[in-house]
């Protein structure tokens, strides 16, 4: 059974464990804790176990922005990221929703296009040699 809810402090350890970056970057673990405490982190549970998380805030030019989307390695390629994106879009309290990903992340590009996003621009100089592509999706009722 799949359930998506706002992450709570008791989820933090599991979110850090599924995050491939947090395994070697303590600052990511601290960021996960901050997102949970801020009430912007949503966790996707499969049979009660944390499988993925996403972070949605509304501080990107007063628009919704999916800041992070992470699926645990053992749960990838099962459609969970798409379900999480759709959940975050439904939670967006603004008429515009944005997100971004590196140019090299072709799997995320495909997911976003399938979820109704369109490319909206790019940002150079975040990751050397791998621009950040920005994507946009209108939100009905936002």
Description of each model-found segment:
Residues 69-76, 101-103:
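A short, internal acetyl-CoA/4′-phosphopantetheine-binding micro-motif in the GNAT/acyltransferase core
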């Amino acid at each position: 059974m799949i359930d998506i809810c706002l992450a709570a402090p008791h989820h933090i350890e599991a979110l850090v464990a599924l995050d491939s970056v947090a395994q070697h970057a303590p600052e990511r673990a601290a960021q996960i804790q901050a997102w949970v405490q801020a009430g912007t982190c949503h966790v996707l549970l499969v049979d009660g176990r944390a499988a993925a998380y996403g972070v949605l805030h509304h501080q990107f030019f007063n628009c919704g922005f999916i800041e992070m989307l992470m699926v645990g390695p053992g749960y990838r390629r099962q459609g969970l990221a798409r379900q999480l994106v759709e959940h975050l879009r439904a939670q967006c309290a603004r008429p515009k929703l944005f997100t971004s990903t590196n140019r090299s992340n072709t799997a995320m590009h495909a997911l976003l296009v399938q979820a109704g996003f369109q490319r909206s621009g790019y940002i150079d100089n975040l990751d050397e040699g791998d621009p950040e592509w920005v994507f946009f999706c209108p939100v009905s009722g936002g």
